[in-house]
């Protein structure tokens, strides 16, 4: 069933394809493809052809449509439906390719061959075509034998690697989400199965399993969900799988490229970060969550979109799979935990929040819980970490300074740290996997590389990462195009094949140059690197430079409008991509906070410190900020000591990758995305078409069909296919090319199917596969024949054996029959009885003879035994001698071998030296010849020089004469140049018109001359006036039109400036409107106030009193508002204190034990808190009471005033008139005030918005102003140019006005051309037969056009000269002809209409020509297709003829064999019946066995589940015990932490007082130390230099002979250069840190003053803390007593342990001694062993207790640190509360005093006057209050703005000063650096020389020792030979041994040598 399901997705249904009805229907309907907006192309039947158009009937709905013939594409017959290789299509066009892919995709067939490569369409669902059965199906099969599959591509790559011994690569290309990663996994799966040294999956090797598990690990850490793809690779990888000679996998290596690390900190909408974060948070258990401090998804800031799930994937299960994969990969658990800790730490980094302090820009960390978690996870100190982030040490000059960071800088540092940590972890993981995959010792012979890189990405806005990804894909596509199209055709030309080079127009090099070109002009990456070196460079300046350098590049575009968010556009092969250059400089430099980096390098966690081991190579933030301003523009290249940017590193990586790929044989897999909705079974035709066009699929198929994709070397072709032509090549024939020609003739191949090159035979696609099939058939025939011969031989042998057996049986039968006849005959019986008796008599005689012989033999035997004993003794002696001789021989052979080796070396050296000598002699001869030649040349040159000198003298005199002429001609030349410039401009403007009229200009000129003569002779003055008027009118009108057009062009040129100016104008308009509104409102308010004041001044004293009351009331209201604000502040502080107190409560409740002392402390703190709360509540109550009293008093005063008003109303009737007038005025004022208030409210609302916008837009406004000024300059320049252009245009108008008269002649000519076009259209129908004639006509037309163009150019130049003269004449005549403008206008209109008609006709002609070109190209393609089909048909005919011949031969053979097969069939049927019965019985037995196996597996599963349950229950019990122990340890740790905390609290105040002195001393010490270090380094370098100079002088003579060691020395030099770079980087950092330290010192001095003030404040709080400290001391003493007891107990336990160990040893000795004493001893032994075990248990308990105590001590220290920080916070809060309380008390006192004064003043002064005017006060009171409040707010805002302005100005001045200081320091540092570099380079050269000489001496010494050893061996061998010559070897050895006794072998040899020497004397 599984196989059937797989076949559905692999094989095509043949019934549908071979349907005859469909074939007939296609032929009858004339089906074609027509364009469709919905489906790309849709089928239609061709009904009728009408000229250029055709009428078609759509198959889908029967609708008839008119379509242009060029848009119609042919349809393939139904038999080509769902074809596996699209190169087989008869009609190759876009519609056919798309239709074939669509049909296969909808049938589940996702793989399709496209010529030499494979096209894959993502199915977006799982298909059953990747099982092991499918792998076995494709294993070892040829490509044409199986349907298309990724396994087939992989198998062909594997087989070609094994056959050709050439490295292979499989490149998966395509957009993001097209399925590259999945296909890569399938490639690795296939190779791991096919190339495994283990046969079955159960026996699968560890390396293969690790190789398969590498992908899941990398996907978890490097893949993420994007909008386009749920498992998008956010990095590129090149997997290199190494194979040995036998084709087995011996190792692998993975290289990664450009991890998108920014995804770790932020993600786009509906996207995820890397999978591992979600896996960990979902799959981690409770224990792991507590260890890693994990939190829910929504608590992490770096997870931008929270918990985004992937459909069909469980993150929890994926976590388990990832951990299992890491286990298989061999990553230990501690490293796994290190990885998970780093991941949790990265997430926690995002939770660190910084806030800006109130008075400064400095950042602060109000809550450090996240920082504590990060520090715990990464193994670093919290305080150092926070200090490194908030106030890092930065080098300023030579000193280090602590610099306070702003909020933005701190946030950037945290994000950069998170990205760098994750990237380093990923890099470590890749190295770890490579280490695991490359551990085999077998050598790799070749490799297959699989490339899976991030696909092409086009988002709404694309950043630096997308540029790098798209740049990579551009390079890969270029490699594909170069391999498929360029290299293929170049090889054809190189091999001398007849081939016309086809340009497919797919060169992507311009786009690649735009990105990567280093200079002339520099590309985008080069410009980015260049900008990174400029300190004031910004992203905007980078964009401006890119636009300036690459603005005219064809692949580069500027954004059309400024409102577009993009900065620039690049036209890639996959489409136009908009890029936004935000933070590109930072991304390219990738800076880091080096303080935190060094802290991480010093981490207590080994894993973290290993990640940051290369901390010296990072780019610090100070390095980026303090880069030299004097960096040259070309300084972006890598130099000594300079950091390398991300772009540079990536470009180098990519260059290496491309070099690797070029050295391999590439196999391309083109992955295509069917839709953007990720839906299965849906295919967007337009999307697929775009991808096919971009990837060059059609061109690849076309070159595969037209070209010769298969090629074989001559020798290999002969070796492989000679079996097909056995007798075609004569024996001993050596010429490979001629042999191949003879073979091809014998094969009867069509000449169109092959080409023979210089070294290879080339075949069209399919031919080689056909030859392979024939070869396989031939080999099977040969093997069958061989098997038949073998079987015949064996049968004949068996027959002969049977014949021998038959003859033997016949003999036996004959003898048996004779015996049966004789046995009853009497004489036979008598013979049988008498014969033994005769033998007995003879036997006695024989016995006597034998006894005599036996005695003789015994004697001989004894003699032989004696001889044998003698011989054995002799043999033993000889064997000993033989062994000695063998040893001697072996030594001699070894010496000979060594001597031979030495001789070979010497001869090799001699040959090398001779070769060198010969080379040198040849060089010397060449040099001598050159010298002679140069001397001869020198003589000639001297003669020439003399001649030239004479000529120079003559010319000098002529030159002086010419100098005078030059001065005069220069003025003329300038004028001519100016005229020439004007003429060139005119030519540029008239170029377009000239192209249209070039072919008829000559005729126009002649007509013009005739017309001018006629006009002069006939028209006279009238015609002259009319001509002048027409010219003037035309000139005026055209001038106006051209000015309009120039205005349009100017607007286009200023497109960017208009957009900017529009935006700026809008903003300025808004600001101006708001300012105007504000000014109007303020003016209206001032006018209203002035009116009120004037009216009030005119009134009597009562109004003055009213104003005084109003001022007092406003003061009271201000006081009330200030009190309310104070109250709100106090309430906020109260809330803060309450929250802090509650937090402290919770912390104290968590940390403190339930002891009595702790409860007392807690109760005291609670009492203090309650007291504080009561005091606050009392203060609040008193405050509220005071406010209530004030309100009551105020209301009473108002009521009294109201009563007085009523009394005064009755009494003072005289004031009623004045009151009425005032009331009318008041009403008017009220209306005005209401209107003002409404307007003011609106303006206030707008003002707030504008203030918010102003801050954002001020920077933009300033930039806009700058741009506007630049554009204004450009506009002014353009205006000047326009003025000059208008003058030129006026002149050209006068010329064109005359030309328009003769345009009527063009009409007849255009009619002629139209008739020609109609004739061409008629001829177009018969183009297929007359194509060659058309090409000839076209060539002739082109030649005519070129000739006409040349003539037109000449005539135009003449005409321009005449026109210039005419223009000058006409200018003079223009002044007289102003009167006749109307007639000229009419004539002009007519001519304009004629011109438009002519231009339209010309455009129609051009369009018709374009259509003809299109039809020609289409017909050319159709002709190519027809030719290819013809080739196929010829090939098929020849194949059919061959098959027919073979079939006839086979038919004759089959007839003869059929009779034999009939007999064998009868026998086989009988045997088959017997075997069937046996098979049935075996099947039954097998079924029974399978049932038993199933039962056993079921029982096994049950037992496993029971075991797992038991283990889980056991684990739960262990976990609970572990948790209890952990809690106990935590409590003890808290106790220890409290102790240390109290000790630190006492020393805190003293530390703050001494801080200033310590800082000053440290700074002085640092300066002195730094200077000492520099002096020491200089002295050391000088000493080393002197020593090296001495060594160099001694070894100069030897260095000349060591030229061969130069390569080794160069390697050492490179290492030293790297060290030098590191040293220079250190020096740079040291200088920068020194400069920053100076700045930090100044800041610290300012801070110290503030600290001194803070110290005074803290002294007040110190007394309170001391009281708490005393209580804590009591607790500490009790805890110390407990500690002492614990320590005593520990010491006692250790003593007991030692005693127990001693007792154990003694008892063990006693047991050993008393083992033989019996039962009592055994009992004693058991008792003692039990006692030992008890003691050991007690010892282990004591050790555990000590460990617990140590843990508690550590935890107590940590807790004390936390309590210190909490206490500091409490102090600050208490101080703030105390200050707030004092302020409130002061305010209360002041308010009381003011109230009393007001009450007394109101009662005494204003009782009489208030009564009359109280009503008016009540009405105007609210209005005035509101206005005063608004004024106060406005004044406050003004003050704030002024403060901000002052701060900004101060900052600007500080920055300017700092910049000047930096410049000076940088100059000094650069000079110092240059000196150091020179010294280091000299030292390096000397060191290299010394090392080379040292190595040479070592080698010579080794050679000398070797020669000495060889000589010693030769001497010893000669001595041995001499010994053998004087006396026998055995005797001498015996003598020596007797003499030496027990001496060593060396002494024996020495003595023997001495004896030999004496003997010789």
From Swiss-Prot:
Q: For the region Mediates interaction with LIMCH1, what residue ranges are annotated? A: 2-838
Query: Which positions are annotated as binding ATP?
Result: 174-181
N6-acetyllysine occurs at: 8, 102, 299, 435, 613, 860, 975, 1024, 1234, 1249, 1358, 1393, 1405, 1411, 1460, 1639, 1794, 1803, 1846
Residue span, Myosin N-terminal SH3-like domain: 27-77
Modification sites for Phosphotyrosine: 11, 754
Describe the subunit structure: Myosin is a hexameric protein that consists of 2 heavy chain subunits (MHC), 2 alkali light chain subunits (MLC) and 2 regulatory light chain subunits (MLC-2). Interacts with RASIP1. Interacts with DDR1. Interacts with PDLIM2. Interacts with SVIL. Interacts with HTRA3. Interacts with Myo7a. Interacts with CFAP95. Interacts with LIMCH1; independently of the integration of MYH9 into the myosin complex. Interacts with RAB3A. Interacts with ZBED4. Interacts with S100A4; this interaction increases cell motility.
Task: From the Swiss-Prot or TrEMBL record, give the protein name.
Answer: Myosin-9
Query: What is the protein's species of origin?
Result: Rattus norvegicus (Rat)
Gene designation: Myh9
């Amino acid at each position: 069933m599984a196989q059937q399901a797989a076949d559905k997705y692999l094989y095509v249904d043949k019934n549908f394809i071979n349907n005859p009805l469909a074939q007939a229907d296609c032929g009858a309907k004339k089906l074609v493809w027509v364009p469709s907006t919905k489906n790309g192309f849709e089928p239609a039947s061709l009904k009728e052809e009408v000229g250029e158009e055709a009428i078609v009937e759509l198959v889908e709905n029967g609708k008839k449509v008119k379509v242009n013939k060029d848009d119609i594409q042919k349809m393939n017959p139904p038999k080509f439906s769902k074809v596996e290789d699209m190169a087989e299509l008869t009609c190759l066009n876009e519609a056919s390719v798309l239709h074939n892919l669509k049909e296969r995709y909808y049938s589940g067939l996702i793989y399709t061959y496209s010529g030499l490569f494979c096209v894959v369409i993502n199915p977006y669902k799982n298909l059953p075509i990747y099982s092991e059965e499918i792998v076995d199906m494709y294993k070892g099969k040829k490509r044409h034998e199986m349907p298309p599959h990724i396994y087939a591509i992989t198998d062909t790559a594997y087989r070609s690697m094994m056959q050709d011994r050439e490295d292979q690569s499989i490149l998966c290309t395509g957009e993001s989400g097209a399925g590259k990663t999945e296909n890569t996994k399938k490639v690795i799966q296939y190779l791991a199965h096919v190339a495994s040294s283990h046969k079955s999956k159960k026996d699968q090797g560890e390396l293969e399993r690790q190789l398969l598990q590498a992908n899941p690990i990398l996907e978890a850490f490097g893949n993420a969900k994007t909008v386009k793809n749920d498992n998008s690779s956010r990095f590129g990888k090149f997997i290199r799988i190494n194979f040995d000679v036998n084709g087995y996998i011996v190792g692998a290596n993975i290289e990664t490229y450009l991890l998108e690390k920014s995804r770790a900190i932020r993600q786009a909408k509906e996207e995820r970060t890397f999978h591992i974060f979600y896996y960990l948070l979902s799959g981690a258990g409770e224990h792991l969550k507590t260890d890693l401090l994990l939190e829910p998804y929504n608590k992490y800031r770096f997870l931008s979109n929270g918990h985004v799930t992937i459909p069909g994937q469980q993150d929890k299960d994926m976590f388990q799979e990832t951990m299992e994969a890491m286990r298989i990969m061999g990553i230990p658990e501690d490293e796994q935990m290190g990885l998970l800790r780093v991941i949790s730490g990265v997430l926690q980094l995002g939770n660190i929040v910084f806030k800006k302090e109130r008075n400064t820009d400095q950042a602060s960390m109000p809550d450090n819980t996240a920082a504590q978690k990060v520090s715990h996870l990464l193994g670093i100190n919290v305080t150092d970490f926070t200090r490194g982030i908030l106030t890092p040490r930065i080098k300023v000059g030579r000193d280090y300074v602590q610099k306070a960071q702003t909020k933005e800088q701190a946030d950037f540092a945290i994000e950069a740290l998170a990205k760098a940590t994750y990237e380093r972890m990923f890099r470590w993981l890749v190295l770890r996997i490579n280490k695991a995959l490359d551990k085999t010792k077998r050598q790799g012979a070749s490799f297959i590389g699989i490339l899976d890189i991030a696909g092409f990405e086009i988002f709404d806005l694309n950043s630096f990462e997308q540029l790098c990804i798209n740049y990579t894909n551009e390079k890969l596509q270029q490699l594909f195009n170069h391999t498929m199209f360029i290299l293929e055709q170049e090889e054809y030309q190189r091999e001398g094949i007849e081939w016309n080079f086809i340009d497919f127009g797919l060169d992507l090099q311009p786009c690649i140059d735009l990105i990567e070109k280093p200079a002339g002009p520099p590309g985008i990456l080069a410009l980015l690197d260049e900008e990174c070196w400029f300190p004031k460079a910004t992203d905007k300046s980078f964009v401006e430079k890119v636009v300036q350098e690459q603005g005219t590049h064809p692949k580069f575009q500027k954004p059309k409008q400024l409102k577009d968010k993009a900065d620039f556009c690049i036209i890639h092969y996959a489409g136009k991509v908009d890029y936004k250059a935000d933070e590109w400089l930072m991304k390219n430099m990738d800076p880091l906070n080096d303080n935190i980096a060094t802290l991480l390098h010093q981490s207590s966690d080994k894993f973290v410190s290993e990640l940051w081991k290369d901390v010296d190579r990072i780019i610090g933030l100070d390095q980026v900020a303090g880069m030299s301003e004097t960096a040259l523009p070309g300084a972006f290249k890598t130099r000594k000591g300079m950091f390398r940017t991300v772009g540079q590193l990536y470009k180098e990586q990519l260059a290496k990758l491309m070099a690797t790929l070029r050295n391999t044989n590439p196999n391309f897999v083109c992955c295509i995305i069917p839709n953007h909705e990720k839906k299965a079974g849906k295919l967007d035709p337009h999307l697929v078409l775009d991808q096919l066009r971009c990837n060059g699929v059609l061109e690849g198929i076309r070159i595969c069909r037209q070209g010769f994709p298969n090629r074989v070397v001559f020798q290999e072709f002969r070796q492989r296919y000679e079996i097909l032509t056995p007798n075609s090549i004569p024996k001993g024939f050596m010429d490979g090319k001629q042999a191949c020609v003879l073979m091809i003739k014998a094969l009867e191949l069509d000449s169109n199917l092959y080409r023979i090159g210089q070294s290879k035979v080339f075949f069209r696609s399919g031919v080689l596969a056909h030859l392979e099939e024939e070869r396989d058939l031939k080999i099977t025939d040969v093997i069958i024949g061989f098997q038949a011969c073998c079987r015949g031989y064996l049968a004949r042998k068996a027959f002969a054996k049977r014949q021998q057996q038959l003859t033997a049986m016949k003999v036996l039968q004959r003898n048996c029959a004779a015996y049966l006849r004789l046995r009853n005959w009497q004489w036979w019986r008598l013979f049988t009885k008498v014969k033994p008796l005769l033998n007995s008599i003879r036997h006695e005689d024989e016995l006597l003879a034998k006894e005599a012989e036996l005695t003789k033999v015994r004697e001989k035997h004894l003699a032989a035994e004696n001889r044998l004993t003698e011989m054995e003794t002799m043999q033993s002696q000889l064997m000993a001698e033989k062994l000695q001789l063998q040893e001697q021989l072996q030594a001699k052979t070894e010496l000979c071998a060594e001597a031979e080796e030495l001789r070979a070396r010497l001869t090799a050296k001699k040959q090398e030296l001779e070769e060198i000598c010969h080379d040198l002699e040849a060089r010397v001869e060449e040099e001598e010849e050159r010298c002679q030649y140069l001397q001869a040349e020198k003589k000639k040159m001297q003669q020439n020089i003399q001649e030239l000198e004479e000529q120079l003298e003559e010319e000098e005199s002529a030159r002086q004469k010419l100098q005078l002429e030059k001065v005069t001609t220069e003025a003329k030349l300038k004028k001519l140049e100016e005229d020439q410039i004007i003429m060139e401009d005119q030519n540029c403007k008239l170029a377009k018109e000239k192209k249209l009229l070039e072919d008829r200009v000559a005729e126009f000129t002649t007509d013009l001359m005739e017309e001018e003569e006629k006009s002069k002779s006939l028209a006279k003055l009238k015609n002259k006036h009319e001509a002048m008027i027409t010219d003037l009118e035309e000139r005026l009108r055209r001038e106006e039109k051209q000015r309009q057009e120039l205005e349009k062009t100017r607007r286009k040129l200023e497109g960017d400036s208009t957009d900017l100016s529009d935006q700026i104008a809008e903003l300025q308009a808004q600001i101006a409107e708001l300012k105007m509104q504000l000014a109007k409102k303020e003016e209206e308010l001032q006018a209203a106030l002035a009116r009120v004041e004037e009216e009030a001044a005119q009134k009597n004293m009562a109004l003055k009193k009213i104003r005084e009351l109003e001022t007092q009331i406003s003061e009271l209201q201000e006081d009330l508002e200030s009190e309310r604000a104070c109250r709100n502040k106090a309430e906020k502080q109260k809330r803060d204190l309450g929250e802090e107190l509650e937090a402290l409560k919770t912390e104290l409740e968590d940390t403190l034990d339930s002891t009595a002392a702790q409860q007392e402390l807690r109760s005291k703190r609670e009492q203090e808190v309650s007291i504080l709360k009561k005091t606050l509540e009392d203060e609040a109550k008193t405050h509220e009471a005071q406010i209530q009293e004030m309100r009551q008093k105020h209301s009473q005063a108002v009521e009294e005033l109201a009563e007085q008003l009523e009394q005064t109303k009755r009494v003072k009737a005289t004031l009623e008139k004045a009151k009425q007038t005032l009331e009318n005025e008041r009403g008017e004022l009220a209306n005005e005030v209401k209107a003002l208030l409404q307007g003011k409210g609106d303006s206030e609302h707008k003002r707030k918005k504008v203030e918010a916008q102003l801050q954002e837009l001020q920077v933009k406004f300033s930039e806009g102003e700058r741009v506007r000024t630049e554009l204004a300059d450009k506009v002014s320049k353009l205006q000047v140019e326009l003025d000059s252009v208008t003058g030129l245009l006026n002149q050209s108008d006068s010329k064109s006005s005359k030309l328009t008269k003769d345009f009527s002649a063009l009409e007849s000519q255009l009619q002629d051309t139209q008739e020609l076009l109609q004739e061409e259209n008629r001829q177009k129908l018969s183009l297929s037969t007359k194509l060659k004639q058309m090409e000839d006509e076209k060539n002739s037309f082109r030649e005519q056009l070129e000739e006409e163009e040349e003539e037109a150019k000449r005539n135009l130049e003449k005409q321009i000269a005449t026109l210039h003269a005419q223009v000058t004449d006409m200018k003079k005549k223009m002044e007289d002809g102003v009167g006749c403008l109307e007639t000229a206008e009419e004539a002009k209109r007519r001519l304009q209409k004629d011109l438009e008609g002519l231009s339209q006709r010309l455009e129609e002609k051009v369009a018709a020509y374009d259509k003809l070109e299109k039809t020609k190209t289409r017909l050319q393609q159709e002709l190519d297709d027809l030719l290819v089909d013809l080739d196929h048909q010829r090939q098929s005919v020849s194949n059919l003829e061959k098959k027919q011949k073979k079939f006839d031969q086979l038919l004759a053979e089959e007839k003869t064999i059929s009779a034999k097969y009939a007999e064998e069939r009868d026998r086989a049927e009988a045997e088959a019946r017997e075997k069937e019965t046996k098979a049935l019985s075996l099947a039954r037995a097998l079924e029974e066995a399978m049932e038993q196996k199933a039962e056993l597996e079921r029982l096994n599963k049950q037992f496993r589940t029971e075991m797992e349950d038991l283990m889980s229950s056991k684990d739960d019990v262990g976990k609970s015990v572990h948790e209890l122990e952990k809690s106990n340890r935590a409590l003890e740790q808290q106790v220890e932490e409290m102790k240390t905390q109290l000790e630190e609290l006492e020393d805190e105040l003293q530390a703050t007082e001494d801080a200033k002195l310590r800082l000053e001393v440290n700074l002085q010490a640092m300066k002195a130390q730094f200077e000492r270090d520099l002096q020491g380094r200089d002295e050391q370098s000088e000493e080393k230099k002197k020593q090296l100079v001495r060594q160099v002088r001694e070894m100069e003579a030897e260095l000349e002979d060591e030229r061969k060691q130069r390569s080794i020395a160069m390697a050492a030099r490179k290492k030293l250069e790297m060290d030098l770079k590191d040293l220079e980087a250190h020096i740079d950092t040291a200088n920068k840190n020194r400069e920053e330290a100076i700045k930090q010192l100044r800041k610290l001095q300012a801070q110290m003053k503030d600290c001194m003030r803070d110290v005074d404040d803290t002294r007040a709080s110190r007394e309170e803390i001391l009281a708490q400290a005393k209580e804590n001391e009591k607790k500490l003493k009790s805890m110390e007593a407990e500690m002492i007891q614990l320590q005593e107990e520990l010491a006692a336990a250790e003593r007991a342990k030692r005693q127990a160990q001693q007792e154990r040893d003694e008892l063990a000795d006693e047991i050993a001694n008393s083992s033989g004493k019996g039962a009592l001893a055994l009992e004693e032994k058991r008792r003692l062993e039990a006692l030992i075990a008890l003691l050991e248990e007690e010892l282990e308990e004591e050790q555990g207790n000590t460990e617990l105590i140590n843990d508690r001590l550590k935890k107590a220290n940590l807790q004390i640190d936390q309590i210190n920080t909490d206490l500091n916070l409490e102090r600050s809060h208490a101080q703030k509360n105390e200050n707030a309380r004092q302020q409130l008390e002061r305010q209360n006192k002041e308010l009381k005093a003011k109230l009393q004064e007001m009450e007394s003043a109101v009662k005494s002064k204003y009782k009489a006057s208030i009564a009359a005017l109280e009503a008016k006060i009540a009405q105007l009171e609210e209005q005035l209050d509101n206005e005063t409040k608004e004024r106060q707010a406005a004044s406050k805002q003004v003050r704030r703005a002024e403060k901000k302005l002052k701060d900004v100005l101060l900052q600007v001045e500080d920055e300017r000063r700092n910049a000047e200081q930096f410049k000076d320091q940088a100059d000094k540092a650069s000079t110092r650096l240059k000196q150091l570099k020179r010294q280091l380079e000299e030292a390096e050269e000397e060191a290299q020389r010394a090392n080379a000489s040292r190595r040479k001496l070592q080698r010579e010494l080794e050679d000398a020792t070797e020669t000495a050893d060889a000589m010693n061996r030769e001497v010893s061998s000669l001595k041995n030979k001499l010994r053998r010559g004087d006396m026998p070897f055995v005797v001498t050895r015996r003598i020596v041994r007797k003499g030496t006794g027990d001496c060593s072998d060396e002494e024996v040899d020495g003595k023997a040598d001495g004896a030999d020497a004496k003997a010789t004397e």
